[in-house]
Amino acid sequence: MNDRVNIRRALISVSDKAGLVELGRALAAAGVEILSTGGSARALREAGIAVVEVADYTGVPEMLDGRVKTLVPKIHGGLLGRRDLPEHLAQMQRHDIPPIDLLAVNLYPFEETVAKGSDFETCVENIDIGGPALIRAAAKNHDSVAVLTSPAQYDDLIAALAAGGTTLEQRRRLAAAAYARTAAYDAAISAWFAQQTGEMFPAHLALAGARQQMLRYGENPHQSAAFYRTGNRPGVATARQLQGKELSYNNINDTDAAFECVAEFDRPAVVIVKHANPCGVALGADLAEAWDRALDCDPVSAFGGIIAVNRPLDVAAAEKMASIFSEVIIAPDAAPDAVELLARKKNLRLLLTGGLPDPAEPGLAWRSVAGGFLAQTRDAGRIGRDDLKVVTQRAPTNAEFADLLFAFRVAKHVKSNAIIYAKAGATTGIGAGQMSRVDSSRIAAQKGGEKIPGSVVASDAFFPFADGLVAAIEAGATAVIQPGGSIRDNEVIEAADAAGIAMVFTGMRHFRH
């Protein structure tokens, strides 16, 4: 069965002019009548391509400052009329509505306008009305009409022209892409309006992203995966990859965890992550010192890990990092000599983001569950010294206060149950993801070994019993930070006082699952 549709008439109205002239020339060479509007018509005409202005074609002038251009029956009837129904064809002939076989439209740059921080009125003016209406009409009638919504689709369309027209399979693919685009566009508008009105969780919440990369596989080789970009928060989605192999699903997940963690700190910091959990976090006078101290926490787990820094990467730090095998280094920027040095490690992926994510920036996080998804605000909670409540007879020293705040900030990024030992601005032991808090405490102490005595300890949630605290005391901890709130808080406080250690409550929990 020959399901090719020969293109005789096309409507082009694009805000993104990339590839427009090449598409226009191919259509003109194939004898296609080109209808167009505004800037698209002007660009085609300047390239010597004959076009018919939509206003001349329909007899209806553009109006309302260009808000109404194509919202007329002659255009929508030409897109929606079914060529296989005699009654449709008769009505089209009676009302002088010729069929339109190809639509090329991309939408006003609403997402880009919002990302630039434009004012409310400018954002509203960049909400496209006619474009989505055209796209949906053409996609609905894909049996007869091909719809292009991206310059990336032009080459295949040009090839189809040479082959005698578009196939049904091609038109269906284009229709699917068209509806995905309008859905994403409407989702962006809906999310922006919800933000403007302060409605974090509207009755209908749409998720939309632009596919940035097809991945080799997902978390495991038998799973398929892709990476979608949803915004401009600095991180792996915005990064330039200077070298190394293609990022994997696990690389992206782990790199995001590392970069979000390292952004928590004002001083030069290094975070090493393995399986989305930090295995070493440290501050330093510079990145080289921070690296040495972060690596010292757990050098075995650091092998094959992800490295994140919160300063432009210098050559001294890069040289140290190059001494072990790592999957990814992510940084806001890097010095040319550091880039040159790391280029010797061909498999190492080097990502430069141009900035750091703001830990306090509001936003939503999602997680899929069977039959739906959970939405919650991002964990943007940050505790300062003034937020701490000393609950023991002994108060922490100034040095302990600094380490307690550092350790609790790390705990926010470790899978629950999380126990963090730290000393002088560096982790000395990390216990992650255990079903009981006492086990996390013991594992962290075991991994830290002789580094643990003199450390402070942070817990991402309250100690339900004194046993987890006792394990930390036995390991040599001198001060504790935890949210508090257990019905056995008094029992835990008594254990701390009996051991002569200091303990503070934050009133804020940092579960992470």
Curated annotation (Swiss-Prot):
Catalytic activity: (6R)-10-formyltetrahydrofolate + 5-amino-1-(5-phospho-beta-D-ribosyl)imidazole-4-carboxamide = 5-formamido-1-(5-phospho-D-ribosyl)imidazole-4-carboxamide + (6S)-5,6,7,8-tetrahydrofolate; IMP + H2O = 5-formamido-1-(5-phospho-D-ribosyl)imidazole-4-carboxamide
Alphabetical list of InterPro entries matching this protein: AICAR_Tfase_dup_dom_sf, Cytidine_deaminase-like, MGS-like_dom, MGS-like_dom_sf, PurH-like
Ranges for domain MGS-like: 1-149
GO BP annotations, alphabetical order: 'de novo' IMP biosynthetic process
Keywords: Hydrolase, Multifunctional enzyme, Purine biosynthesis, Transferase
GO-annotated molecular function: IMP cyclohydrolase activity; phosphoribosylaminoimidazolecarboxamide formyltransferase activity
Keyword Hydrolase: yes
Stored PROSITE patterns: MGS
GO cellular component: cytosol
Pfam families in UniProt: AICARFT_IMPCHas, MGS
EC number: 2.1.2.3, 3.5.4.10
Top-level taxon in the UniProt lineage: Bacteria
SMART domains: AICARFT_IMPCHas, MGS
Pathway(s) served: Purine metabolism; IMP biosynthesis via de novo pathway; 5-formamido-1-(5-phospho-D-ribosyl)imidazole-4-carboxamide from 5-amino-1-(5-phospho-D-ribosyl)imidazole-4-carboxamide (10-formyl THF route): step 1/1; Purine metabolism; IMP biosynthesis via de novo pathway; IMP from 5-formamido-1-(5-phospho-D-ribosyl)imidazole-4-carboxamide: step 1/1
Keyword Hydrolase: yes
Domain remark from Swiss-Prot or TrEMBL: The IMP cyclohydrolase activity resides in the N-terminal region.
HAMAP family for the chain: PurH (MF_00139)
Recorded family membership: Belongs to the PurH family.
PANTHER family in UniProt: BIFUNCTIONAL PURINE BIOSYNTHESIS PROTEIN ATIC, BIFUNCTIONAL PURINE BIOSYNTHESIS PROTEIN PURH
Protein name per UniProt: Bifunctional purine biosynthesis protein PurH
Organism of provenance: Acidiphilium cryptum (strain JF-5)
Gene: purH
